[in-house]
């Protein structure tokens, strides 16, 4: 069996890894448009802040290491078309434009996504960067130490935007975050958490402007950015723009090959197969089942892409195992605060039209003086009493609690079961009642009124 895998990020790497494990005699062709395989964009912050010294170490694999396992690795190779009937692909060498054709028995698409570009005047000026991919990472690192770059504007306040803002603020730049939503990190946290994080960022000199977007980007005679004009009419001095306002799937060239939805996402079944037999798709260009609602949605997280990649590999010859539903569990730090969330929150439930209730509480991590506060919110279905989501934050690392909530969501656990679930106690680690127990007991009280 000959397996072709297009794309070398999380989903592509896991697919190749899975094929090597499940079909050791398979021939594997692995295609990457860039000159580097398996780069981890989620590790850019570590490189920008000096935690990781070598840009090339932010990866899962090397070309030599994969070739030693028998994988045929093709870098600088862009797949431009697919012929499902002939089971063939056309590949263009991006360096010389030479086109070749290659056959496959099974094809896995791990196409990923590209940063959303601002559709405004001035969008083609110099010094407008994205925080995605190895090439951008190298440019961003240079910008951190560029004496001509003093004012940095970050468009978007999701994880990528917050990481960019903190990294450049620590590098001594004056940073402004601009977001059209009313709060930062609105996809991940409710206002009880974002209010604290907003103040934290502002205390570190970062200016935050929400409920507004970019109207125009202004440049100078050298076509370099000099300022931004927002929809409120404010002009913001800017030497560097970092676009972090979302992503779009890199699937335009596939519209006549496989079925895409209205967002351009590749439609797959529960086994990752597309509308075309023998063609599978994984990663940020696809949807995955969201456990709290049972519906499919885009959740662009590395673990999801890897789960899909492993599932696709396992199901190549026979549909044997469905891709597991996920809760969108994720975590981040903002200066001294560390937070994690999973499942539904009040703000996301409202957008999705799902009826939920929530309880919020603060607690101490351990029974000791001068102890870090823990902020926790539990979201649940008021009708079935099932746990649907949670958020946690503290200056100490308590994020692992979210993994238990994610499992509770997958297993349809109720707040009644969570209220007295067994968690360990040791004074140096935790309290006799875990914060999850306390929140679930509070939820019981709210429901039983």
Where do the language-model regions lie?
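Beta1-alpha1 glycine-rich phosphate/pyrophosphate-binding loop at the start
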Residues: 1-72, 165-189
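FAD-site-proximal beta/loop scaffold in flavoenzymes
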Residues: 126-148, 224, 234-311
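Glycine-rich dinucleotide-binding loop and its adjacent helix/turn
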Residues: 109-171, 207, 262, 268-270
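Short hydrophobic core segments
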Residues: 102-112, 237-246, 309, 385
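A Rossmann-like FAD-binding core segment of flavoenzymes
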Residues: 25-29, 68-95, 102, 171-268
